[in-house]
From Swiss-Prot:
PANTHER family: OS04G0344100 PROTEIN-RELATED, TERPENOID CYCLASES_PROTEIN PRENYLTRANSFERASE ALPHA-ALPHA TOROID-RELATED. Binds 3 Mg(2+) or Mn(2+) ions per subunit. This is Epi-cedrol synthase. Constitutively expressed in leaves and flowers. GO terms for biological process: diterpenoid biosynthetic process. It catalyses: (2E,6E)-farnesyl diphosphate + H2O = epi-cedrol + diphosphate. Belongs to the terpene synthase family. Pathway: Secondary metabolite biosynthesis; terpenoid biosynthesis.
Length: 547
C-alpha cells in the first residue's frame, strides 16, 4: 500500500524503473561439499611455490609474473601475508635498482603495493634525443606492460606522462591493424585502452582474466583451479547477501512508498561489493549496500521531491535526530527517517558485541554533515545560484556522499578498524579529498546532461563555464584533466603520505575511486542502468564459472 497521498506539485526526475524484480530474492545454497578441503590444499601448494621462488633470486622475475596472475585471478586475499613478505623482501633487496627482467611489471607491482620506487628506471627506454626508442614500438607485450605501469604515476613524473602518450599512440595504431582485428592481442589492447588495470574492479578483472589465463600455455593448473573454485565459493556468499538485501528492500515496499526515488537495491549491492569484495567483509557489504540505498533516497528527496520548506524541516529532524520534528512532513520522508533509525539501531547492536558501538556516532556525524550540504544545494537550486568553483567544491565534496559511504563501510570491518581510522577521515586527508574530487567530477561529467534537462543545482560544469567564461567543451576538457590529476594524487597519497594508515582502510578509498570509473565513466550508469552494468551484475551473481 502506498504512503504517497498528496496534492503538492513536485519536481519529477522521472528516474528509470528498477529492472531486477524478485530475481535475487530467493537464495539456493550451492553445493560446496568437499570444496573447502580442495581449496585448502591448493592454497598450501601456492604458498609453497611463493616462498620457494622468493628464496631463489634467479626466480624473482617469474615470481612477479606469478603474483600478478594471483592478483588478476582475484585470489590475492588468500595470500596477503606471503605477498606482503615478497614485496618487502624485494624492496629491501633491490630498492630502486631492479636487475631482473620485465621492468614495467616490477615497477607496477611495487607501486601497487605501496613501495614508491623511482620512475627514473625508465630513462633507459629513451634515446639520446629524449624520445622513446623505436625498438619499443612493435613490442606489443612490452607496450602493454609499460602502458599499465604508467598509470601508477604521481604529479610531476614527466617520464610516465610521456610513456602514457607514447604507449597509447602505439597501441592504438596496432589495434587498427586489419590483420589483428579478431585476434586476442587486439582484444587485449582495446580492453587496456578502455580501462587500465589500475582502474579495474578486482572482481570484474577476475571474471575477465580467468578465461584469458586458461588460454596461456604457461598457466599454472593449480592457480587456475583455485581461481575457479574460489570465485564460485565467494559468489555463493555474495548471492546469499544479495538475497538478504532484496528481502530488506521488499519489506519497505520502496517501489510504492518512494516512487520518486531511484530503486537500485541490486546496483547498491554491486557498488558495495566493488569496494569490499573479499569474504571477510560480509558485514560491511550488507550494511553498506543498505546504507547506499538510504543515501540514494536522501539524495533524491532533496534533489527531486521535497519542497524547500519540507527539506528545511527534514534537515532539522536529522540534525536533532528527533522524530518529533517530522510532524506535517510527507509520509515518504518519515519512512526514510525510520529506515535510518532502524539501520543505526541494528548496526549499533552488531558493533556492541566488540565494544565498538560508539563507531555509530562517527556515521551519524558524517550523515548530518552530508544532509547539511544537500540543504545548501537545495537553496542554490531554489535561488538559481551558480556558485564559484571554490564554493561548489566545498559543498559538493560532501554532498557526493563518498566520505559518508567510507565512514559507514569502515564501521563493519571488524578488527581491522579502530577509532584512529575514523579520526583520520575526519581530518579530510588528501587521499580522501582526491577520491571525493574524482568521484564528484566523474559524477558531474556522467550525469550533467540528464540533470540539466530539469531544474537542478548547478554542477561543476556550469560553475566552470560561468567562472571562466568557457564553452561546455572547454569545461569538459578541463574536468577530464582534473580526473587524471586526481588519480595521480590518489597514487601519491596511497604510496607516500598514508604510510601510517592501515593498508586495508586505504584500499577502500582506492576501490571507491575504481567503482566510479565503472559506474560514471561517460554516463551515469547507476541511474540509467545499461547493458554493460547489467552484464556485470549477471556475471557476478547469476553465472557461475565452470570448473
Amino acid at each position: 500500500m502506498s504512503l504517497i497521498v498528496e496534492d503538492v506539485i513536485r519536481p519529477n526526475a522521472n528516474f528509470p524503473s528498477e529492472i531486477w524484480g524478485d530475481q535475487f530474492l530467493a537464495y539456493d545454497q550451492d553445493e560446496q561439499e568437499g570444496v573447502e578441503q580442495v581449496i585448502k590444499d591448493l592454497k598450501e601448494e601456492v604458498k609453497s611455490e611463493l616462498l620457494t621462488a622468493l628464496n631463489s633470486p634467479t626466480q624473482h622475475t617469474e615470481l612477479l609474473k606469478f603474483i600478478d596472475a594471483i592478483e588478476r585471478l582475484g585470489i590475492a586475499y588468500y595470500f596477503e601475508e606471503e605477498i606482503n613478505q615478497v614485496f618487502q623482501h624485494m624492496y629491501t633487496a633491490y630498492g630502486d635498482k631492479w636487475t631482473g627482467g620485465n621492468t614495467s611489471l616490477w615497477f607496477r607491482l611495487m607501486r601497487q603495493h605501496g613501495f614508491f620506487v623511482s620512475s627514473d628506471i625508465f630513462s633507459t627506454y629513451k634515446d639520446k634525443e629524449g624520445r622513446f626508442k623505436e625498438s619499443l614500438e612493435k613490442d606489443v607485450h612490452g607496450l602493454l606492460e609499460l602502458y599499465e605501469a604508467a598509470y601508477m604515476f604521481v604529479p610531476g613524473e614527466g617520464i610516465l606522462d610521456d610513456a602514457l602518450v607514447f604507449t597509447r599512440t602505439c597501441l592504438d595504431e596496432i589495434a587498427k591493424n586489419p590483420s589483428l582485428s579478431n585476434s586476442a592481442v587486439s582484444s587485449q589492447i582495446r580492453e587496456a585502452l578502455t580501462q587500465p588495470l589500475h582502474k579495474r574492479l578486482p572482481r570484474l578483472e577476475a571474471l575477465r582474466y580467468i578465461p584469458f589465463y586458461q588460454q596461456q600455455a604457461s598457466h599454472s593448473e593449480t592457480l587456475l583451479k583455485l581461481a575457479k573454485l574460489g570465485f564460485n565459493q565467494l559468489q555463493s556468499l555474495h548471492k546469499k547477501e544479495l538475497s538478504i538485501i532484496s528481502k530488506w528492500w521488499k519489506s519497505f515496499d520502496v517501489a510504492n512508498n518512494l516512487p520518486y526515488a531511484r530503486n537500485r537495491p541490486v546496483e547498491c549491492y554491486f557498488w558495495a561489493l566493488a569496494v569490499y569484495f573479499e569474504p571477510q567483509y560480509s558485514e560491511s557489504r550488507v550494511f553498506l549496500s543498505r546504507f547506499f540505498s538510504i543515501q540514494t533516497f536522501l539524495d533524491d528527496t532533496y534533489d527531486a521531491y521535497g519542497t524547500y520548506e519540507e527539506l528545511e524541516q527534514f534537515t532539522e529532524a536529522i540534525q536533532r535526530w528527533s522524530i518529533t520534528c517530522l510532524d506535517g512532513l510527507p509520509e515518504s520522508m518519515k519512512l526514510i527517517f525510520q529506515m535510518l533509525v532502524k539501520i543505526f539501531e541494528e548496526i549499533e547492536e552488531i558493533l556492541s558485541k566488540d565494544g565498538k558501538q560508539h563507531h555509530v556516532n562517527y556515521i551519524k556525524e558524517t550523515l548530518k554533515e552530508a544532509v547539511q550540504s544537500y540543504m545548501t544545494e537545495a537553496r542554490w537550486a531554489k535561488e538559481e545560484y551558480i556558485p564559484t568553483i571554490e564554493e561548489h567544491t566545498k559543498v559538493s565534496y560532501i554532498s557526493i556522499g563518498y566520505k559518508l559511504a567510507l565512514v559507514a563501510g569502515f564501521a563493519c570491518m571488524g578488527d581491522v578498524i579502530a577509532d584512529d581510522s575514523f579520526e583520520w577521515v575526519f581530518t579530510n586527508p588528501p587521499l580522501v579529498n582526491a577520491c571525493c574530487l574524482l568521484c564528484r567530477t566523474m559524477d558531474d561529467l556522467g550525469s550533467h546532461k540528464g540533470e540539466q534537462d530539469r531544474k537542478h543545482v548547478a554542477s561543476t560544469i556550469e560553475c566552470y563555464m560561468k567562472q571562466f567564461d568557457a564553452s561546455e567543451q572547454q569545461a569538459y576538457e578541463s574536468l577530464n584533466k582534473k580526473v587524471e590529476d586526481a588519480w595521480k594524487e590518489i597514487n601519491r597519497e596511497f604510496m607516500i603520505t598514508c604510510k601510517d594508515v592501515n593498508i586495508h582502510v586505504a584500499m577502500r578509498v582506492l576501490n571507491f575511486s575504481r567503482s566510479v570509473d565503472v559506474l560514471y565513466k561517460n554516463k551515469d550508469h547507476f541511474t540509467h542502468v545499461g547493458v554493460e552494468v547489467i552484464n556485470h551484475i549477471k556475471s557476478l551473481f547469476v553465472d557461475a564459472i565452470i570448473t
